[in-house]
């Protein structure tokens, strides 16, 4: 439905400024709403009154973000939601105040006017389906837990370095393993290691199926003389490390649960019944999940991130939007005889990270990707730039496969 009403919403943490224009661009009304359930109910009632009970699909809302609770609420209410880049909004604002004056009311008016004058410059947002939304949120939970785990491990290493450096040098990179936490419970200091028997350490190694370490090696290093720090300092650090290990064990358990849920969800997407080509003469059309999973270099986390963060773009088979969203499309700055091609910085950081790992692994396992990567490196391209070029090709192939509904065919050299 064609837009008849234009709303600018300058969002904030506790309050949002709203400005309403009609079909001719005339300023109708403005107000503030609170960031609460009742606040959005008031917004719906107010817009209905001001627009003479117009349908929500005929009302467009422009704001300077493409995600978050405000966007989710507006999409759920049925409004057309348009996102504008903050840099674009700054240029629109300069039309009204070259001096740079800025306030919430002016920003809301600028957003509404931008949607009225140049709707093609804004991006229409679509609500992701429940599967893509679940993948996105679960993958973000995994990333957050992974960062928490790394932070706890760094704190433990710092405390160990302060009074028990032998333990840190032996297990510093493996602190998240249950085996290391079991060793700490029995040998939190050199004195406890002196009392520990070789047989008990071997039993612990066998119980956790650890072969990289030997009991003699562990006991020899942990029984070494400790740093000459005060007894009280050592005791308090030991208590702190014990608490950190307990937190680390909990985070590790939660991380495994989230990863299992992520794998289960991806598996369910693969087993969903296709909606086309279900006749007996034609094979069933593979799902988007199966098509992307067949690509070289795509693992569980890359697949979940692609479907979760770019699910709408993938559903629309929009290659140009996907390469911009993933930071693959370069930025060209040309003026006169000067022409510079730069890396795109305005992109989804999670997709940028996934593209890097996708291209990196594909360059290792796929002969075509490896050949392309080596050719670019020979021409003097940096590692990152070569990988972005490989990722660009992979995205083009993936979009073509999604349109055709075919799986990636590996060469004989790969198999």
Task: List the predicted regions and their residue ranges.
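A detector of single, family-specific signature residues
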Residues: 1-415
């Amino acid at each position: 439905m064609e837009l008849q009403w234009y709303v600018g919403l300058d969002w904030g943490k506790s309050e949002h400024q709203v400005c309403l224009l009609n079909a001719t661009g005339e300023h109708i009304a403005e107000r503030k709403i609170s960031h609460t359930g009742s606040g959005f109910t008031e917004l719906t009632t107010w817009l209905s009154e001001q627009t003479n009970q117009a349908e929500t699909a005929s009302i467009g809302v422009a704001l300077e973000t493409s995600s978050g609770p405000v966007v989710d609420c507006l999409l759920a209410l049925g409004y057309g939601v348009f996102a504008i880049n903050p840099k674009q909004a700054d240029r629109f604002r300069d039309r009204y105040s070259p001096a740079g004056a800025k306030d919430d009311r002016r920003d809301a008016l600028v957003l509404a006017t931008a949607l009225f004058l140049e709707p093609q410059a804004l991006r229409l947002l679509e609500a992701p389906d429940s599967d893509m939304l679940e993948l996105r949120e679960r993958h973000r939970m995994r990333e957050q837990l992974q960062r928490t785990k790394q932070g706890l491990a760094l704190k433990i290493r710092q405390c160990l370095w302060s009074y028990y450096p032998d333990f840190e040098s032996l297990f510093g990179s493996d602190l998240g393993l249950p085996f290391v936490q079991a060793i700490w419970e029995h040998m939190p200091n050199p004195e406890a290691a002196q009392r520990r028997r070789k047989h008990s350490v071997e039993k612990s190694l066998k119980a956790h199926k650890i072969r990289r370490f030997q009991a003699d090696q562990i006991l020899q290093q942990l029984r070494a003389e400790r740093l000459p720090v005060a007894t009280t300092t050592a005791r308090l650090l030991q208590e702190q490390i014990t608490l950190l290990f307990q937190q680390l064990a909990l985070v590790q358990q939660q991380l495994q649960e989230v990863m299992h849920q992520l794998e289960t969800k991806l598996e369910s997407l693969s087993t969903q019944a296709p909606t086309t080509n279900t006749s007996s003469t034609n094979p069933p059309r593979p799902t988007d999940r199966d098509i992307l999973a067949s690509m070289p270099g795509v693992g569980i986390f890359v697949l979940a991130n692609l479907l979760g963060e770019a699910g709408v773009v993938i559903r629309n088979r929009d290659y140009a939007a996907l390469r911009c969203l993933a930071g693959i499309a370069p930025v060209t700055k040309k003026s006169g005889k000067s022409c510079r091609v730069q890396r795109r910085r305005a992109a989804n950081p999670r997709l940028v990270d996934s593209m890097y790992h996708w291209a990196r692994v594909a360059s290792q396992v796929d002969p075509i990707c490896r050949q392309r990567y080596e050719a670019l490196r020979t021409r003097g391209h940096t590692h990152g730039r070569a990988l972005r070029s490989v990722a660009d090709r992979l995205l083009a192939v993936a979009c073509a496969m999604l349109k055709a509904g075919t799986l990636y065919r590996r060469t004989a050299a790969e198999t």
